[in-house]
């Protein structure tokens, strides 16, 4: 592998770390994530030890990319990471920090299920170093929660959010996010908007508001429920977007809304084509490499870890690794970048893909004519029209080189 630049002006993007904890209380019928229903005691300490060894191997194997870099953010996802004790999370974060430095303003997010978090555990996570909690609320309607297979009810959800608000008021938590879904089975427009109003009333700094989609190999795929039609979905989105905007939330990504200054750093790094280490069952990572004193990236790799806990707990970590060909980089870059509503700096395209702007000139001319984007000398900007035709826009880059 090629050496990364150690110069002050390295072309490498920010570096994050994703940690996957695969266990949950029960598998939700819509979930296609790598999660495994808890059937016995979770081997918490054993798994944490393997996570640390996994990270050590990555830091050695990918040394030319990660040397002299600090972690910009950490995201602990699942599964249900809040099944792990606060002591376990504290030990894990401490061991990580001993192996790779943290940025002074690092964002550390932990996903939590309201049905698995007591107030003491919440407090313990913040004492462990977690400064952002992401809560999988999904709905405040108990009937919908049952259909979705969630283990919490609306009262438990609001109680968890209230405690997160208290922790934030005490400066023990920088931010918190609520995950909320719409387009649920047999959901009316008014029910979806009522969910959103209740979420807004709780004043989270960040809201992830996304449409339920039926994914392959899920229980919903085998027994499809009745979902709102396209007209109803459009009404939900349009009226919901107005509610969020009126409440002071800014949409910065397809499904992400935040109060000013509370965008999720970790997800922004994904969408800005940043780098991320990945440890844990089924975790996916991306790393860039650059030659000494180079102004641009010249190699990008993607890799994934062993999915099943059985193999992972036997020390079989790395499952697959591949180089991202130059012919694929434009599509991958814009597939991420055009999810964001901010301008795309042309200089960053060259820096992070190692390609010249001329490689996408014809595609951009066509996109301009179609009204998918606007352009100035420094950047490209997706339009409202472009958001509606995002797939058509991205198809332009499938074979560019």
What are these regions (language model features)?
Residues 22-35:
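Local cysteine-cluster metal-coordination motifs and their immediate loop/turn environment
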Residues 24, 205, 275, 378-379:
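Beta-strand-connecting loop/turn residues
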Residues 369-378:
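A short, conserved structural fragment
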Residues 380-387:
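Basic, amphipathic "hinge/linker" alpha-helix immediately C-terminal to the N-terminal HTH DNA-binding motif
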Residues 387-401:
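Short, amphipathic alpha-helical interaction segments positioned at domain boundaries
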């Amino acid at each position: 592998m090629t050496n990364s630049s150690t110069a002050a002006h390295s072309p490498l993007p920010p570096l994050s770390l994703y940690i996957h904890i695969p266990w949950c209380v029960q598998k939700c019928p819509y979930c296609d994530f790598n999660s495994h229903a808890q059937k016995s005691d979770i081997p918490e300490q054993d798994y944490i030890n393997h996570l640390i060894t996994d990270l050590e191997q990555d830091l050695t194997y990918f040394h030319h990319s990660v040397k002299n870099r600090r972690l910009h953010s950490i995201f602990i996802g699942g599964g249900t990471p809040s099944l792990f004790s606060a002591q376990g999370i504290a030990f894990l974060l401490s061991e990580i920090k001993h192996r790779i430095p943290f940025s002074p303003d690092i964002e550390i997010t932990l996903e939590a299920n309201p049905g698995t978090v007591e107030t003491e555990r919440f407090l313990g996570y913040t004492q462990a170093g977690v400064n952002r909690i992401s809560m999988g609320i999904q709905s405040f309607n108990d009937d919908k929660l049952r259909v979705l297979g969630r283990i919490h009810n609306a009262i438990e959800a609001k109680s968890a959010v209230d405690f997160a608000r208290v922790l934030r008021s005490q400066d023990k938590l920088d931010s918190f996010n609520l995950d909320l879904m719409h387009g649920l089975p047999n959901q009316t427009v008014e029910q979806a908007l009522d969910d959103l109003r209740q979420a807004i009333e709780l004043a989270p700094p960040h809201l992830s508001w996304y449409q339920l989609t039926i994914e392959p190999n899920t229980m919903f795929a085998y027994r499809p429920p009745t979902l709102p039609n396209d007209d109803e979905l459009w009404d939900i989105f349009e009226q919901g977007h107005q509610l969020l905007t009126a409440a002071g939330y800014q949409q910065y990504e397809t499904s992400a809304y935040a109060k000013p200054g509370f965008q999720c750093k970790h997800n922004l790094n994904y969408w800005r084509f940043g780098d991320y280490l990945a440890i844990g069952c089924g975790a996916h990572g991306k790393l860039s490499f650059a030659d000494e004193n180079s102004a641009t990236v010249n190699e990008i790799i993607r890799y994934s870890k062993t999915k099943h806990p059985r193999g992972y707990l036997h020390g079989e970590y790395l499952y697959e690794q591949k180089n991202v060909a130059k012919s694929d980089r434009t599509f991958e870059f814009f597939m991420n970048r055009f999810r964001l509503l901010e301008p795309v700096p042309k200089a960053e395209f060259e820096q992070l893909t190692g390609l010249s702007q001329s490689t996408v000139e014809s595609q951009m001319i066509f996109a301009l004519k179609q009204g998918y984007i606007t352009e100035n000398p420094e950047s490209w900007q997706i339009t409202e029209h472009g958001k509606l035709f995002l797939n058509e826009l991205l198809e332009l880059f499938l074979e560019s080189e």
